[in-house]
Amino acid sequence: INEVWYGDTTYGPYITIDGKKHRVYIIALIDDASRKITACEAFLEDNYISLMKVIKSGISSCGKPKLFSFDNGANYRSNQMTLLGARIGVAINYCPAYTPTSKAKVERFFLTLKNQYLCLIKPNDYHDLDTFNKDLRAYIQKYNTTPHSSLEDNMSPNDRFYKESNIIIEMSQEKIEKS
């Protein structure tokens, strides 16, 4: 666990805020070995600030990985990301362009998220991002505790992740916030 975390962004549904429809962007990090979603949140903007919030959340709750693997999107491939990796001691890998198979686990999670949850949402179901994120967190909790057919003994992502909890490298909240 915490060897590689894959990160990516997907389009979420439209939600209506103050009478206007807004596209939601969902950023997720997934642990390669356990399939645990270490962090996931929806935003109205797909940018580095949003990505940083997700990374800090993941490290706060699950420790730090040895490697982040991202696609080549602008918010992932930035000088700020290089500096972040150096500050916290995490290597950063960028997948070759137009090769979704190089980050297949996060892409598969997004497909599951869309087929099981996002497809049910209508634009008028949500009127603020906080409520949407609350429900998204509930879905992630369910996902992380559901047995996964590709894991040993059909373990859940959480069970697989915490089976090796002794190797989690935690960071102080102060260091996370300074990153």
PLM regions with names:
Residues 70-72, 76-88, 92-118, 127-133, ...:
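RNase H-like two-metal-ion nuclease catalytic core shared by retroviral integrases
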Residues 31, 43-47:
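A short acidic/small-residue loop/turn micro-motif
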Residues 59-62, 89-92, 113, 117-121, ...:
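A generic secondary-structure signal for well-formed alpha-helical elements
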Residues 35-40, 93-95:
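Short small-residue beta-strand/loop micro-motif enriched in glycine and branched aliphatics
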Residues 1-28, 36-37, 48-57, 61-66, ...:
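Mobile-element integrase/transposase regions
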Residues 9, 32, 72:
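Residues immediately flanking
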Residues 39-41, 67-71:
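Short catalytic-loop micro-motif centered on adjacent basic/acidic residues
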Residues 144-179:
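C-terminal, beta-rich DNA-binding module of retroviral/retroelements integrases
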